[in-house]
Amino acid sequence: MKLETEIVNEKQKVLIVSKKSYQFLDYLKKCLKKYSVDVFVSPNNPGNLHIFDYCFFINEVPPLAQLKKSATFFIFFFINKKHLSLSLFKNLKKYKAIKINNENLNHNEVDRILWFIFSQTQEKVLKIDTVSPQLKKNVTLTPFRLKIKKLSTKKNLIILGFSLILLLHFLFIPFLITSSFFTYLSFQALKKEQVESSQSNLDKANKLYLLTKKLYSFSRPTLLFFNLALLPDSFIDIDLSSQQLVNQGIVLLKNGKEIQKIIFQKNKTDEEILELKLRFVKLHQGLKTISDQSLFLAQKINFPLTFFKKFNQQLLDYSDLTGKADKFISYFELVFSAKEPKKYLILFANNMELRPGGGFIGSFGILTTNYFTLDDLKIYDVYDADGQLTAHIAPPKPIEKYLQLPHWFLRDSNFSPDFLEDYNKALFFLDKEMGMTNFSGGMIITTSAIENILSVFGNLYLPDYKEYINDKNFYLKTQLYVEKNFFPGSIQKKVFLSSLIDQIFIKAENISLAKLGLAIKKSLDEKQIVVYLNDDKIQSLIDSSYWSGRVIEPNCSSPQKNCLIDYLFPYDANVGANKANLFINRFFNLKTTVDSQGNINHLFSLSYINSSPGETFPTGYYRNYLQLLLPLNSKIKSITKDGVLVEDSDQKDNLYKTIGFYFEVPPKKTVEIKISYQLGEKLTGDKLYQLIVQKQIGASNSDLVLQFSLAKNVTLTNHNFSPIVKDSEIVYNTSLSTDKIFLMELNKYE
């Protein structure tokens, strides 16, 4: 049986209610019928309005209750109704009204009315002003009007009309550009923390944006019809999102300033503590919003122009930065929200005399906190403690051999590259020397970290010394007032540092909180500050950011993969009792060869350049006890200094294989160290090769070059860095500014 499908087009029904037979109604009906519409005309309201799709009422309004019940679209014509109020229609959703001052409508005016009725415009009222035929006959044209009439040919009017329509459709563009410009100015002012200027420019941008939206609402239907609305839609959304982002930044900055004022107050009231808690909640919300909006904007601003690419990268950086700032503030809040007093050990390490754990410990401080309050920071000279040690503590062999010290003290306690070991050793010495116990955590702050922090404060005036201290002269002034004429037991170091810290606390309320946060984060990322806290929950967060200065255990970062683990950690110990590290530059090169049998051979080269001007203290020879942590199964082939074999070296196996040896770098000389070794594990089949290179606490950033040479039967399928690859040679240049992990998916064919 054959089945047929019959398509039935149901016509729309239109009712026209008019007591008077107006001349324009005939043309109106004719136009409606062109669109397959059934038109019904009645002099009275039939009552059953719900059966019609559209109802036209000419100079008549049915009961409002009847209109509300019906889903019909109502069109009201008001002819010569000068004082009519349209407020009675405010509760109707589906209606439009046409106000006409004369019943003699021409065809163009009827067409205009129909376009208005069936368009998607949000406007509800259309006004039509006409001139009666009688008046037209009596008009006497002046010479000027005659000239206008001559120019007003049909062709000219069409061109003029088209030009005006085109102008109206694109009139929103200059206002959008100006709005975006003021938004950009507001953003730049916010970066400089100029709140008033930022707010002023943002207000101007917002007013122009609202005007742009109004003008664009007229243009959008036409642009949408021609598929041209996507680009202006995107730019308008970008402008709005940018304004919201800047506004949130202003709110965040103001809130941060209030937190800054309260946090340094002592003896806070319950109301102030409650306000501080609420402001921290608001701060977290603001940072989350800014991070999300920055990411959203970066995805929107995906244009090939250089300006947009640069701005896009800035937004991605802000998203990442605010996310990390939120985490950093969470640490701060958790530490300082404890209701009972807490005591923290701060070790000040001079990394110009570099040691495995950061640098020579010249001073230490005890920071006391109590429920959202920084109570006190007391500074001690390290010799205040070491001078009280009566027991003999045997030092590590390099200290005994090269520094020729038979005893071990707090000042040399950080001889491990792992901060937790150094922290526990410092606690041991403080207990033995001064009976200090019950610390809730500790940190090392290097000279470089102090310089980073001082860069935020500008010039700090020390009244006792009549000197201005800043990040540029801090180290030199410290040498002048601390190291000159120093002897164990003198108080000049303690007095100088205490005076400096007092001025830091005094000025802390007025500095840029954002810049301070960035300076601290930079120091944490570059391991110029490392932290350990007894609270496991907080410490796990610190560990996840690699801010704890720990030696990383040899575990595969991807448990699902068949992993081959490689590891390298070089660290120095300046055993020359001078500050030569101020003049030392280091360059690292790791050349790795994977042969056809899967053997992995390394040649690690270290270049040391000593730019010391002479041998006078604090400069001079760089006497270094270099140690390297390598995979436990590594086989050492050779160690050379400037091509000469180093025969005197120390080696021990624990979690890693540790290699250590002594060498010197004279002033104005360069020394090259090379260590050749082979991994005990071979590459077989498909494996994830994982190389971790750790940076020493307190070390300056060093250039690092990685070179990989692969046999023909070994292929690289994926990696997490961007090297230069040519045939089987892979080269990658980077800076060892923090701990690095390099991943490569390798495949060895038999």
What name fits each language-model region?
Residues 476, 710-713, 721-723, 749-750:
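Charge-rich, low-complexity terminal tails
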Residues 634-653, 715-741:
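A surface/secretory-pathway sequence property marking extracellular, secreted
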Residues 139-143, 733, 738-740, 750:
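Juxtamembrane membrane-insertion context
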Residues 46-49, 740-750:
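Secretory-pathway-linked proteins and extracytosolic
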Residues 597, 666-670, 686, 725-744:
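Solvent-exposed, conformationally flexible loop/turn segments
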Residues 156-174:
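Hydrophobic membrane-insertion alpha-helices, especially the h-region
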Residues 2-11, 18-26, 30-36, 43-52, ...:
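Non-catalytic, solvent-exposed segments at the cell envelope interface
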Residues 13-15, 37, 165-167:
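Alpha-helical transmembrane segments and their juxtamembrane interface "caps"
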